[in-house]
């Protein structure tokens, strides 16, 4: 018997949860939480994504990653988030898709707003990404990223 609470579609777009983005005023301080309190053992080096206005550091978990993001430069979009949430917090969730342009076009056809120019840009994993406006995603900022070669 089919569960009426579950929606079925012909070709699901959503893929694996790649990471949860966490905004922080200090990646160095946030790393201490994941390492010292939660026991994370694989913490990648911090690196800059100036074109997106963020510093990034990935923390590996057994089945996904936490993406720590800190403002980079005066125009960082993270400043606005931290103004409302001074200690930081969950910023976005990121799902993998097979084809970022097809995913973008599908989301637009369904009436969803894509942030920025709407054109995919290269994200922290080196693959194209887009962000879907939280107003269309139940209040959650959703990043869609083209599936990277090789899983982390």
Regions from the PLM with identified roles:
Residues 8, 12, 24-31, 37, 47, 57-59, 73-76, 81-136, ...:
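Vicinal oxygen chelate
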Residues 18, 40-44, 141:
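Extended macromolecule-engaging scaffold surfaces
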Residues 37, 50-53:
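An N-terminus-focused feature that recognizes amino-terminal "leader" regions
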Residues 54, 61-63, 85-90:
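Short connector loops at helix/strand junctions that flank enzyme active sites
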Residues 8-31, 88-95, 146-152:
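N-terminal beta-strand motif that seeds the catalytic metal site of vicinal oxygen chelate
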């Amino acid at each position: 018997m089919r569960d009426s609470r579950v929606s079925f579609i012909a070709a699901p777009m959503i893929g694996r949860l790649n990471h949860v983005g966490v905004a922080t005023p200090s990646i160095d301080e946030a790393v201490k939480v994941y390492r010292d309190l939660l026991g994370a053992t694989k913490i990648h080096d911090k690196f800059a994504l100036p074109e997106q206005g963020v510093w990034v550091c990935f923390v590996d978990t057994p089945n996904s990653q936490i993406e720590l993001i800190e403002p980079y430069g005066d125009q960082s979009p993270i400043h606005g988030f931290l103004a409302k949430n001074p200690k930081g917090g969950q910023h976005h969730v990121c799902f993998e898709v097979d084809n970022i342009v097809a995913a973008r076009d599908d989301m637009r056809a369904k009436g969803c707003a894509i942030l920025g120019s709407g054109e995919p840009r290269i994200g922290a994993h080196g693959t194209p990404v887009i962000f879907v406006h939280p107003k269309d995603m139940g209040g959650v900022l959703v990043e869609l990223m083209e599936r990277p070669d090789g899983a982390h």
